[in-house]
């Protein structure tokens, strides 16, 4: 039972990471602003995502803190679609579950231990360190739709090939990693940051809807209503209200909501700051998992 709760918690980490997976001013503006994904060709940008959540599985509480740090450079722009070269710079997770403290960090120790918590932490730290500082490519249109992600699958394959583990264990790890870390995984993770734009001029009070779906073991549909709350110089503050739902054939069910504020630089579409609260319930394999989380996203131009 202890093992199943631990596995479910780690699996939930990757699922919730996806949902994760969102200066100066010249005074309040009464006029509208064009709002679209408009990162500049030849420029670089950094994103930092922090997710702090509490889960409850069969009356067992789990505390998880997730950190992701990314850098991107816009290498091409055909007027409609931007090509972006991206790298994970650091990945970390601290988890307290069933009385065990599990720490995973791409910059931390990857030493293995007989202790189950340290062994898992060391193994996943190896996974994280094998992914960072390796570029992959993303194509994004002006509404923030992620059209294509390429190169991440090769990063995962290379990382697994470099690990000194038995062939049977490698095959199992490969099957798991292909589901948790893949081109589609990256696409799902960044959809919430990029897929927010109406691609038109907006004024305070305007509303629009955006939706996207995630794949994998815990696929879900995300439907968000965005409201323009304030325009201050070039910066637009949005209120986001998201409904989360799914019903898979295997019986997995996800329901939830997420609310928050997003500050966007209208000149580029860079998400300068975003803070949100999430409440979600996942039912899988007869177990019910309640999730209450807070997330922060910060973007900066290099």
Predicted regions mapped to residue ranges:
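C-terminal motif of bacterial Sec signal peptides marking the signal peptidase cleavage site
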Residues: 19-22
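Residues within alpha-helical transmembrane segments of multi-pass membrane proteins, especially transporters
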Residues: 11-13, 17
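Signature of exported/secreted
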Residues: 26-302
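Bacterial N-terminal signal peptides that target proteins for export
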Residues: 1-10
């Amino acid at each position: 039972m202890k093992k199943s709760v631990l596995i479910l918690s780690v699996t939930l980490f990757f699922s919730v990471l996806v949902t994760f997976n969102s200066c100066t001013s010249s005074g309040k503006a009464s006029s509208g602003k064009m709002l679209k994904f408009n990162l500049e060709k030849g420029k670089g940008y950094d994103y930092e995502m922090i997710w702090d959540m509490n889960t409850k599985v069969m009356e067992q509480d789990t505390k998880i803190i997730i950190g992701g740090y990314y850098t991107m450079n816009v290498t091409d722009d055909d007027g409609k679609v931007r090509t972006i070269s991206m790298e994970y710079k650091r990945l970390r997770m601290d988890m307290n579950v069933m009385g065990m403290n599990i720490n995973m960090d791409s910059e931390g120790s990857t030493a293995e231990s007989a202790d189950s918590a340290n062994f898992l932490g060391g193994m996943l730290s190896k996974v994280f360190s094998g992914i960072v500082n390796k570029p992959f490519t993303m194509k994004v249109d002006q509404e923030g739709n992620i059209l294509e992600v390429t190169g991440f699958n090769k990063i995962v394959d290379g990382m697994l090939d470099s690990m000194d583990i038995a062939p049977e264990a490698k095959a199992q790890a490969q099957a798991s990693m292909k589901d948790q870390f893949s081109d589609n995984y990256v696409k799902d993770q960044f959809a919430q940051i990029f897929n927010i734009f109406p691609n038109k001029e907006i004024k305070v009070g305007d509303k629009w809807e955006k939706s996207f779906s995630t794949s994998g073991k815990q696929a879900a549909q995300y439907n968000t209503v965005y409201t323009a709350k304030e325009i201050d110089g070039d910066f637009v503050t949005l209120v986001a209200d998201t409904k989360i739902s799914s019903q898979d054939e295997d019986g997995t069910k996800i329901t939830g909501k997420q609310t928050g504020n997003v500050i966007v630089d209208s000149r580029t579409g860079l998400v300068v700051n975003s803070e949100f609260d999430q409440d979600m319930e996942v039912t899988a394999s007869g177990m019910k998992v309640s999730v209450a989380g807070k997330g922060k996203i910060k973007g900066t131009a290099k």
